[in-house]
């Protein structure tokens, strides 16, 4: 029996932008894309910022794009997830955070907050520290101590004074919190098993060992005078007037580690949280019965509580297709194969029942501007054979060219990449239409739409421009305010499959 396949075709890195200069999408001759755009219902989708779970104004990327597409909902990345929780009042009601505060109150012990002291947004955000201070204040906690890790890597190398000034203003405003130690991230956030670095941080925080200063500002000033900048500031102790440490971490204390990115948070967390820690001798005073909270899930190896548990993405597009006994194909060349498989399945490696995967090798060249067609023709031939063989109900396809060649920042090769993809697109969509099927033509983020800046410089990064969506079925009308998370519900509508409640995206078909 002839199948009427529904295909989701992702032109990776292909967005729409009015400005013609440096725009490979407008420069390319793409008769097939233009034909489908003119003949069929079309619209644009937001593929960056909060529409895909990133901070406002941040460009999208392939991983995030495919996660959102496959999930059929906005998948909040950790930074945005915590930001949204703060904005909507959920942060101060977080049971895990409240339990840490309650522990310190009931035991009459201290609450320690530690993490990277910047707004870099890569490992942490200082606003999350401020939210914790507000939470502690609202719960009536007085003994709250901050162990600041200085950045200088995701932000300017000598920016610590700015963040300390702002932090001290917040401490003054809220009437809670005191800085107890400072340490460059080189020590406290090592991830390469350089335990001697982590130990220096640990001993400052637990034993009050290390250079001592009467204020955080004095510590930074002294380091700068010695040519040591933020990232490399030696773990240092802030002292009271009598020379004793402001605070050390002791038995029964509570700790909240407010970094959200795991890789550089694991080792120092192991040091405090794990009873069976053996990487260095923690000494006699190692704090017992700590109530240790990680902001997000750092690792199975960390024996702590988790405030924002991982989002398990249930009922992704692939899972729903499988539950409905529909045959699905994932096809791409090497560069984007993980995206149409692992990321589109919500971070799942295994295939679903009824899922077939075709991987076409990407060409072995130093950079793809040397071969802008990449393996698009081979991908197309393999897919046409599948369509002819009536094997698939649903097809998930990625063309890597506009993104991978766009990263070269070179106009002519990127134009060639798009013209190649357009040729392939025509063959594939015509084959699907000949079977009575439907194609959804779209993209995951921008790139090829700006490969040269208005000043004439190469532009190798992604863009925040909207991406196209075309549905090759007459008589439909599409919404104009769509996001990537609306693509899976649209595909399910075309397949006449019920949308699960976990998919909070909405079909684009009016």
From Swiss-Prot:
Active site location: 62
GO cellular component, as recorded: cytosol
Binding site for substrate: 123, 153-154, 185, 191, 261-264, 336
EC assignment: 5.4.2.12
GO molecular function: manganese ion binding; phosphoglycerate mutase activity
Record's catalysed reaction(s): (2R)-2-phosphoglycerate = (2R)-3-phosphoglycerate
Cofactor binding, per record: Binds 2 manganese ions per subunit.
Residues bound to Mn(2+) 2: 12, 62, 444-445
Function field: Essential for rapid growth and for sporulation. Catalyzes the interconversion of 2-phosphoglycerate and 3-phosphoglycerate.
UniProt cross-references to PANTHER family, sorted A to Z: 2,3-BISPHOSPHOGLYCERATE-INDEPENDENT PHOSPHOGLYCERATE MUTASE
Assembly and oligomerization: Monomer.
Family: Belongs to the BPG-independent phosphoglycerate mutase family.
NCBIfam families cross-referenced by the UniProt entry: pgm_bpd_ind
Name this polypeptide is given: 2,3-bisphosphoglycerate-independent phosphoglycerate mutase
UniProt source species: Priestia megaterium (strain DSM 319 / IMG 1521)
Highest classification ranks of the organism: Bacteria, Bacillati, Bacillota, Bacilli, Bacillales
């Amino acid at each position: 029996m002839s199948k009427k396949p529904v295909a989701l075709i992702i032109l990776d890195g292909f967005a729409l932008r009015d400005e013609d200069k440096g725009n490979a999408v407008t420069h390319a001759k793409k008769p097939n894309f233009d034909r489908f755009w003119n003949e069929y219902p079309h619209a644009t989708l937001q593929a960056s910022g909060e529409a895909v779970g990133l901070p406002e104004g941040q460009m999208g990327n392939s991983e995030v794009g495919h996660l959102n597409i496959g999930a059929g909902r906005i998948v909040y990345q950790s930074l945005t997830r915590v930001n949204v929780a703060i904005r909507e009042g959920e942060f101060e009601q977080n049971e895990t955070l409240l339990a840490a505060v309650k522990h310190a109150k009931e035991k009459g012990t201290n609450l320690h907050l530690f993490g990277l002291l910047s707004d870099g947004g890569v490992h942490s955000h200082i606003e999350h520290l401020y939210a914790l201070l507000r939470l502690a204040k609202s719960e009536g906690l007085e003994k709250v101590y901050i162990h600041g890790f200085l950045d200088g890597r995701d932000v300017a190398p000598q920016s610590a004074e700015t963040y300390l000034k702002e932090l001290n203003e917040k401490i003054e405003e809220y009437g809670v919190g005191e800085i107890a130690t400072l340490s460059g991230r080189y020590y406290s956030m090592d991830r390469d098993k350089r335990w001697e670095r982590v130990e220096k941080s640990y001993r400052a925080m637990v034993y009050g060992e290390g250079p001592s200063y009467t204020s955080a500002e004095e510590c930074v000033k002294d380091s700068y005078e010695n040519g040591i900048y933020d990232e490399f500031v030696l773990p240092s102790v802030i002292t009271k007037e009598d020379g004793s440490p402001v605070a050390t971490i002791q038995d029964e204390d509570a700790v909240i580690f407010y970094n959200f990115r795991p890789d550089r948070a694991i080792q120092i967390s192991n040091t405090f949280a794990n009873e069976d820690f053996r990487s260095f001798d923690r000494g006699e005073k190692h704090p017992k019965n700590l109530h240790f909270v990680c902001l997000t899930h750092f690792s199975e190896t960390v024996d702590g509580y988790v405030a924002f548990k991982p989002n398990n993405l249930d009922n992704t597009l692939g899972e729903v297709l499988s539950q409905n006994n529909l045959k699905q194909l994932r096809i791409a060349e090497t560069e984007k194969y993980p995206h149409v498989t692992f990321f589109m399945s919500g971070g799942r490696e295994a295939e679903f029942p009824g899922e077939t995967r075709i991987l076409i090798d990407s060409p072995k060249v130093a950079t793809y501007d040397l071969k802008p067609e990449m393996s698009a023709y081979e991908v197309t031939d393999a897919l046409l054979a599948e369509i002819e063989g009536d094997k698939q109900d649903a097809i998930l396809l990625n063309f890597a060219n506009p993104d991978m060649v766009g990263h070269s920042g070179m106009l002519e090769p990127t134009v060639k990449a798009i013209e190649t993809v357009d040729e392939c697109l025509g063959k594939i969509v015509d084959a699907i239409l000949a079977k009575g099927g439907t194609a959804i033509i779209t993209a995951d983020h921008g790139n090829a739409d700006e490969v040269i800046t208005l000043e004439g410089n190469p532009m190798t990064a992604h863009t925040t421009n909207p991406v196209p969506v075309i549905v090759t079925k007459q008589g439909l009308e599409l919404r104009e305010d769509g996001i990537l998370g609306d693509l899976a519900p649209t595909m399910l509508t075309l397949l006449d499959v019920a949308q699960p409640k976990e998919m909070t995206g909405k079909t684009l078909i009016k």
